Amino acid sequence: MTRENLEQIAESENQRRAEFRDGINVCVATGCLASKSQMVKDALDREVANRGWEKHCQVKGVGCLGLCSEGPLVSTRSGALYKKVIAADAGDILDHAGKAPLHRLLCSTDIPFFHDQQKIVTENSGVIDPERIEDYIAAGGYSALMKALGEMTPAQVIQEVTKSGLRGRGGAGYPTGLKWSTVAKAVGTQKFVICNADEGDPHRVIEGMLIAAYAVGASEGYIYIRAEYPLAIKQLRAALPQAEQLGLLGTGICGTSFNFRIELRVGAGAYVCGEETALIASVEGKRGTPRPRPPYPAQAGLLGQPTLINNVETFASVPPIIRKGGDWYAGIGTEKSKGTKVFSLTGQIRNTGVVEVPMGISLRKMVFEIGGGIPAGRKFKAVQTGGPSGGCIPSEFLDTAVDYESLAQLGSIMGSGGMVVMDESSCMVDVAKYFMDFCMIESCGKCIPCRAGTYQMHRILSAITNMSATPEDLKMLEELCDLVKHTSLCGLGQSAPNPVVSTLKSFATEYKAHIEEHTCPAGVCGKAVGANL
């Protein structure tokens, strides 16, 4: 595969697309599939065939169109976006193809949810068919790899990534360039690249891994994905052989001496395998439990060899950095948190879905502009960031910038981009118990502080929500939070107390009401099982 070959594929695909008078894109990502978008696509395909429009109208399944709360979503080449589409709407949609939009299904795109985003990682989402490599190439795919292999040395690639200020998008935000540099300098008989993946644009992730492997001198890669994501597994199983067939994976990649292959590893689903050393153990076929560090994976990871581990969003950020330059990327975001971040915006909010925003955007803008605010006239209470181990942030901190340092100061984390909004109907003690229940179940049990500590914290939280706790229990809960945070082996245990610590700090009156007055101010405890999110 040469640059000329790549350009020929892109030109051929663009010519093929131009032959269609009209184009209809159906979101077939997980959220819309759950709302039966596959039935919508099938109905559109049938209607096109019945009308004999196969040469005039292209119906394509695409990645997430973003506004999941309005799914199934369908977009058209003329720019219309349709919401809550059902199979029976297929005929009407085709009747309006290339004409005035179908107003009864029209979803306004002139809202902050869409125009306040800055799409870099998700630029292909909703545009290309993730299972067709030709679609990806036509959108500029693999051009960054060609540039890296043909115009840059491995050291220059690392320099560009370092210059960009990119930080790991899966957790603590470790500088990506520094991690790559450490692996590149490490001595070993072989080096590995591992991607921790649950979702993603498959060829974008593969391209990012290829560039990383070239930069650090790795010859083998693994994409680790949990079994409960069958769609992502299906798409990756289609993408890997496509890349191999075009000479983008394997030996002598793009006519160079660079060799790299990628193998897909499906995990059993343990949350703790998000921790690097636990993930490595799982890839090796062992039980997914973390080990003490040092040595770090960069020095001694998979099979004891230097190993680079990043998550999907980190790898997906690399191709545009190589294409446009590190300075371009560093110009987005804040002084210490560069670029954009993808969030899954959910909870008690009008607009739920997947958004990509510049680092430094305020929580207020996320909730009340992009998210559309709180429905049913209720009041905002808190937003929880960073997944099950994140902290709950109250209304007085809504003007906080969304970046690594600012969230850490509030006792929360960026994590992989979860953002859950809660209103006045949520009991924050019940919320803390809900997340602690998850951490307790997901603890691998290797270290006593996490294994026993999460159990004891959950026991006390259960007693509080059952109105049977004492002030001594509350004191014990605070002591346990500190103990588990500072003595657990890995990030799961170290961050498990975050929801408790943050709610104790910002919603202490709710804890006291449960213990001293035996009442739940939100009216949740004693009525429902699990958090009212």
Name these PLM-found stretches.
Residues 233-359, 371:
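Hydrophobic alpha-helical positions that pack around
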Residues 101-163, 310-325:
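Flexible inter-domain linker/hinge segments
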Residues 1-22, 37-61, 78-103, 138, ...:
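Ferredoxin-type iron-sulfur electron-transfer modules in oxidoreductases and energy-metabolism complexes
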Residues 48, 208-210, 360-375:
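Short amphipathic, charge-patterned alpha-helical segments
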Residues 201-215:
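Histidine-anchored nucleotide/phosphate-binding helix
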Residues 146-187, 330-331, 336, 344, ...:
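Accessory "access/gating" subregions that flank catalytic or transport cores
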Residues 37-38, 69-75, 172-180, 233-238, ...:
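Short acidic, glycine/serine/threonine-rich loops at helix termini
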